[in-house]
A protein has these predicted regions:
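Bacterial N-terminal signal peptides that target proteins for export
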Residues: 1-9
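C-terminal motif of bacterial Sec signal peptides marking the signal peptidase cleavage site
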Residues: 17-20
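N-terminal (or domain-start) structured segment
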Residues: 25-131, 177, 181, 192-219, ...
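An extracytoplasmic/periplasmic, membrane-proximal ligand-sensing/linker region
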Residues: 47-49, 190-192, 196, 279-333
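A ligand-binding cleft/hinge motif common to bilobed small-molecule-binding domains
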Residues: 114-124, 186-191, 214, 219-252
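C-terminal lobe and pocket-closing loops
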Residues: 226-294, 319, 323-326
Length: 333
């Protein structure tokens, strides 16, 4: 009996030893692979519907770029990426809603830096769009244009500035506090030596354009996608674009810098997860977005709306967005 027990125990020890050696061998071989690919190989994502929330109404620039990206992601992963338009609070309601979701990779916030970073810098948002989310990637970049109605009393930028100087606080400007329009207005006032009458006539571009066409404001700053038809019909006059260089396909429109006013503000369209999302999921989605920004069809689609593909990975987003918030905080102080 004792011999049988000893034999059995020896057999168990031998088996455990062989299993241990096998595990060490597997561990060693996996260590030769790339870190991200090893992690990603263990993650099956997505396996169900992914909700993509954006803080604006349907039909605007953010909505269009989000839907273009989401369609490409559906093609790649074979799962629905459902776009949800959630307005209110200049985007803060949508942001907080996504922030409160489980960090399981199935809830995404799609927004742009023209609003998020200004909100953070001015304290309009009581949270950080970088530190309180998990950044994934940037997908597109667009510029903002300032315009007047054809029927207005001015025909160019100089005439508007002349009247604004003669009548401080009388020229009406559509401003959404804590957005790119807020920053642009402040920079215009500083560089042009004017004071504008800043009016809140709506959050989204559609609402603000209705107010503009209803003569509630004299000046409005929006993406070209929102005004193309009106400009082509001659209803609106573009005074300039707030970019370092003239926009592709819009070379006839002067930058503000070319006209002597250093006002530059581009909008980067970003993808974020709730804080704490698995890095493997982040890497999978970031790699997919990088592929999308290199896709010819996607590039051509963006160009139709006078935007460009613009990829930044998580590390670059974190660094550059923090730097921009710090710069904006210093400016608004």
């Amino acid at each position: 009996m004792k011999k049988a027990i000893k034999f059995f125990m020896s057999l168990v020890v031998s088996l455990l030893f062989l299993i241990s050696c096998g595990n060490r061998g597997n561990s060693g071989s996996s260590g030769n692979n790339d870190g991200n690919s090893t992690v990603n190989a263990k993650i099956n994502w997505p396996t169900k519907i992914v909700t993509v929330t954006l803080p604006y109404n349907a039909g605007g620039d953010t909505d269009i770029y989000c839907r273009l990206m989401s369609r490409k992601l559906e093609e790649k992963f074979g799962q629905p990426f459902v776009v949800v338009n959630m307005t209110g609070g200049s985007g803060i309601i949508a942001a907080k809603t996504v922030m409160a979701e489980r960090p399981d990779g199935y809830n995404i916030l799609f927004n742009h830096t023209g609003a998020s970073l200004v909100q953070e810098a001015t304290g309009t948002a009581d949270f950080s769009y970088t530190d309180d989310f998990t950044n994934v990637a940037t997908v597109a970049q667009d510029n903002t244009y300032v315009l007047i109605a054809k029927s207005t009393r001015w025909s160019n930028l100089d005439e508007m500035i002349e009247e604004a100087k003669a009548n401080p606080g009388q020229v009406r400007y559509s401003q959404v506090y804590g957005s790119v329009t807020h920053y642009i207005c402040s920079r215009m006032e500083d560089t042009m030596g004017i004071e504008l009458n800043k009016l809140d006539v709506g959050t989204g571009a559609a609402e603000r354009l209705v107010a503009f066409m209803g003569d509630q404001v004299d000046l409005i700053a929006v993406n070209y996608i929102n005004i193309e038809d009106y400009v082509e019909r001659g209803d609106f006059v573009v005074l300039g674009v707030f970019s370092e260089e003239r926009s592709p396909g819009m070379e006839e429109i002067l930058t503000m810098k070319e006209q002597g006013y250093d006002v530059v503000s581009s909008k980067n369209y970003e993808v974020k997860f709730p804080k704490g999302t698995d890095q493997g999921i982040v890497d999978i989605l970031s790699a997919a977005i990088k592929e999308i920004t290199e896709d010819e069809e996607f590039t051509e689609q963006l160009r139709r709306y006078y935007a460009i593909p613009f990829y930044r990975d998580q590390e670059t987003m974190n660094r550059e967005d923090r730097e921009e918030v710090a710069r904006l905080k210093e400016y608004f102080e």
